[in-house]
């Protein structure tokens, strides 16, 4: 609530929340100190996880919650409530405390850019796509260095530590945030009436899909760059596994399928948060399907399978992955275009 009060952009508040959740999840594994409210949340779980380095087996068990953890969570609750109350009482009506829309863009620059990119120029979209992979890589690298008794000093094990939670839980919801942001303006007021009279449904959906795919692909390039740079800094022996590049291509294809699906969902639903929640649910279902061997069933599962976060040198059936991703791209875009063509413009108000 305090983040939503501080930032007028839902995107900024959600991005910080995702980053905090990722940090808290990693801190729960590598440290017993609770530095953030998100790590406090994980510490209150009645389920404990133990890892035996000798046998490399992980076990789950019920545990009692320490009084100190409960006390610290109450301190966070009271502290953030009082901070939010103070900020709310001092804020002027109708103004955001931190405006993220102060940059003026010239008309000549606007004319050379796609309307979808112009929208994103006024949003801090770079924050989660830069910081969350960086946080994941930094914490994963620390975990990699500190657990050499369990992990091997190889490129393969470094990749599993840097990309494990990113590929399984966080990348798809990030794409969901981006797609919801791209469709937010269309769902405001009577903008549908204007937009659908000046552009075709096919071009509208195609432009949004292309924009989301391009930016998400740049995020994958950033993830790859961090991985390669950190491996060189650590002085890992040997070369990067040759299959790594095929993994990145598979991830980009999966991202294209996810952006097509998420863009269509964001077009259907007026709610900003619902498609994001569906993306997170899709990641959980995708993880289950991947474990059961049905990685081709959903684009969320092809992303987990294609990235190879659990084993970069594992099996990769690229033709099946390509067929699955192509199906979801054409199906999602086709359904979206057909929906826009058959719907009355007034129904979108």
Predicted regions and their residues:
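Secretory targeting signals
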Residues: 1-10, 25, 45-68, 130-181, ...
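Pore- or pathway-lining transmembrane helices of multi-pass membrane proteins that form conduits
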Residues: 8-28, 129-132, 269-287
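Transmembrane alpha-helices and adjacent helix-loop boundaries
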Residues: 10-11, 186, 257-261, 285-290
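Terminal transmembrane helical anchor/hairpin motif
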Residues: 19-99, 142-158, 280-349
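Hydrophobic/aromatic residues in alpha-helical transmembrane segments
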Residues: 79-84, 175-179, 188, 226, ...
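Aromatic- and glycine-rich beta-strand/loop motifs that create alpha-glucan
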Residues: 92-130
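Helix-loop-helix units of permease transmembrane domains in multi-pass membrane transporters
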Residues: 180-214
